Amino acid sequence: MKELVEIMAKSLVNNPSAVVVEEETTGTSTVLRLHVAPEDMGKVIGKQGRIAKAIRTVMKAVATRENVKVVVEIV
């Protein structure tokens, strides 16, 4: 799942080398923290959070298939 978030984020930003995804798993729950360069933050979030919501929706679908809970944080 970490790789999927990283691929999606790198395709959106101008500085793909600054994209870092941290994964923290506890039991059946996974927290993915997406770090991007400050100037790319708006591109990852999108207008009214649409891009961020789309990323979270895709990850929720993947997590449902794998029977886990996933939270995507953009920091």
Residue ranges of model-derived segments:
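RNA-contacting regions in translation and RNA-metabolism proteins
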Residues: 1-43, 47, 53-75
